[in-house]
Regions:
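Membrane-embedded helix bundles of polyisoprenyl
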Residues: 103-109, 119-159, 164-177
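N-terminal membrane topogenic signal
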Residues: 1-6, 116-119, 163-165
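Alpha-helical transmembrane segments of integral membrane proteins
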Residues: 4, 92-96, 119-126
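Charged/polar, solvent-exposed surface patches and flexible loops
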Residues: 8, 79, 157
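Membrane-interface coil-to-helix junctions
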Residues: 11-106, 131, 142-144
Length: 177
């Protein structure tokens, strides 16, 4: 079973590596990111003094709109990647992060709560989770869709009686993703 899961992870990373490595020849999805939220991430990354200041006004965004109207949390992991990395690097790290979590989340959900036990069903779970992880979507709010199977897995674990700190931490961390 471990070989099947590791094969799925290797295929996922090979798929992501084709798109984003090497960086000078990257073929990241073709979109006009200037019309979306990515320009807000870039402007926010160049600001200082905005942390937990809900009235912080940015002149470069919609002619002086307060930063809190953009819907960006100061604790959002994905948005804060743009503070520490260049925009392309932050985008690539975010893609690897939320697609990996999406793969693991759906794999755990299918393996533990949906499919019966057995190596054949692990193969079905890995291939379905791999399909889910590489699904094409526009990641404006980072992993909101791809994190849901992991959240649902944690809720089902608590509901079934195997309450662990890990499950509670996943539920608490979900709004910050």
């Amino acid at each position: 079973n471990l070989v099947i899961v590791l094969s799925g992870v290797i295929i996922l990373y090979a798929f992501l590596s084709i798109y984003y490595l090497p960086p000078e020849d990257a073929v990241a999805r073709v979109h006009d990111y200037l019309e979306g939220i990515f320009s807000v991430y870039k402007v926010r990354a160049e600001l200082s003094g905005f942390f937990l200041d809900y009235d912080y006004t940015v002149q470069q965004i919609f002619n002086g709109v307060p930063l809190n109207l953009t819907g960006l949390s100061d604790f959002n992991v994905g948005a804060n990647l743009y503070l520490f990395f260049d925009p392309f690097d932050a985008y690539v790290i975010n893609q690897f992060l939320f697609r990996t979590i999406g793969f693991i989340g759906l794999l755990l959900l299918l393996k533990d709560h949906v499919l019966p036990k057995g190596s054949y069903y692990v193969l079905i779970a890995v291939s379905t989770a791999l399909d889910f992880a590489v699904i094409n979507h526009f990641p404006t709010r980072f992993g909101t869709i791809l994190y849901q199977p992991l959240l649902y897995w944690s809720i089902l674990n608590i509901y079934s009686g195997s309450r662990k700190l890990r499950d509670i931490m996943i539920i608490v961390a979900y709004p910050f993703m």
